[in-house]
Design a protein with these regions (language model features):
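Bacterial N-terminal signal peptides
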Residues: 1-2
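Gly/Ala-rich beta-loop-alpha elbow adjacent to hydrolase catalytic centers
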Residues: 119, 138-139, 143, 147
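Lipolytic serine-hydrolase domain surface
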Residues: 6-49, 62-66, 70-133, 152-355
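Alpha/beta-hydrolase fold active-site loops
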Residues: 53-54
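The conserved beta1-alpha1 loop
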Residues: 57-61, 140, 173
């Protein structure tokens, strides 16, 4: 995972106001819980005494700073707005900014798992205040583990679909094991999660009305990546390119495929309310989704045996950009959206539920 280069900041200059943050609750060095975070209610965050009727919670993924979490949440809101789906979006911001290496990745998984209870408490408080409102959740990358942990927490206290707690969940490029959504009680689910987290199928079936998994077989953080690079960069007059396939950062550290790259494992049983969708075609080949620091995902080929430092933008084709699910800001006006990414399909599926 240390082979990929991430810009220092993927953040817009304008901060997004609607954030529920548990940052500072966990030690980024060892993942231990150092303080209990008492989150304000959703209505307090929205600065509104009236229930909104419908609310979305967005949960960001691994290695997002506080500012990046705000930027992504705002981008989800703007992308929804572009589809004429105008509802408030609250970002759930958690301690994901561990070291950008395999050790940091493992710590981030632990922190994500432990944040599930915090998210579950936040959800329950909102539904206690606004029992008739539809609550929707969108999670990106490792944020999917936060959400699955939250759903498990709700399931374990007896929440069912009859309680009308979670209307829908959308996972975008989920950085979790492709067996995690199984109805079967597989020991592997328990073994790969710290603290232990059972397979999520029963919790999904019981707690969530509609559950969607958006996967992308070209996602550069999750799937195998074919890199085309100039074999003779010193010669401007030839077109001598080499094709090399590298494992993704996820596949370099995990022993199984991610749910967000190829969908659920074919052998497992999943609940009827679980659906896989291949959204590769919705993720454009634009390398800079937030319009801040250029390419969203670079790799230094020297780390793979190249003789010199050679930074290569891995986003060259449809589906490559792991940060494109939430949409793409406009080059001329970054406060607007030029492409809604996979959020277009999210809004379409919400409308289909209503109709």
């Amino acid at each position: 995972m240390g082979f990929y280069s991430f810009p220092e900041s993927h953040a817009s200059t304008q901060s997004y106001p609607f954030i529920a943050s548990t940052r500072g609750s966990f030690d980024l060095a060892d993942g231990t819980n150092i303080q209990q975070e008492n989150l304000p209610s959703a209505l307090n965050i929205l600065n509104n005494d009236n229930c909104p009727g419908e609310l979305t919670i967005y949960v960001h993924g691994v290695w997002a700073s506080e500012q990046e979490a705000e930027e992504q949440t705002e981008r989800v809101f703007l992308s929804l707005l572009n589809t004429d789906y105008d509802i408030p979006v609250i970002g759930f911001s958690w301690d994901s900014n561990t070291a950008k290496n395999p050790t940091g990745w493992n710590l981030a998984k632990v922190i994500a798992n432990q944040n599930g209870q915090n998210l579950a408490n936040f959800i329950l408080e909102f539904k206690n205040q606004c029992p008739n409102d539809d609550l929707r959740i969108i999670a990106h990358s490792l944020g999917s583990k936060v959400v699955l942990s939250a759903i498990q927490s709700l399931y374990e206290i007896g929440i069912t679909n009859a309680d009308n707690i979670v209307k829908s969940v959308h996972l975008l490029g989920a950085a979790v094991d492709d067996e995690q959504v199984s109805l079967d009680k597989l020991q592997e689910c328990v073994n790969i999660n710290d603290p232990p987290l059972p397979c999520s199928g029963e919790a999904i079936e019981s707690v969530v009305s509609n559950f969607y998994n958006f996967y992308d077989s070209e996602d550069n953080m999750l799937a195998f990546e074919e890199v085309l690079f100039d074999a003779t960069p010193w010669n401007w007059f030839d077109d001598n390119f080499l094709s090399v396939t590298y494992p993704s950062p996820y596949l370099m550290t995990e022993t199984d495929n991610p749910l967000g790259a190829y969908g659920k494992q074919s052998e497992i049983n999943t609940p009827e309310n679980y659906q896989d969708y291949n959204v590769t075609a919705y993720i454009g080949n634009e390398p800079d989704s937030d319009k801040v620091n250029g390419c969203d995902l670079e790799v230094n080929l020297r780390n793979y045996g190249w003789l010199i430092d050679y930074y290569y933008c891995t986003i060259t084709k449809t589906g490559d950009n792991h940060f494109g699910y939430m949409g793409y800001r406009s080059e001329t006006n970054p406060q607007t959206i030029e492409d809604t990414g996979a959020i277009e399909l999210v809004a379409e599926q919400w409308r289909n539920e209503i109709n």
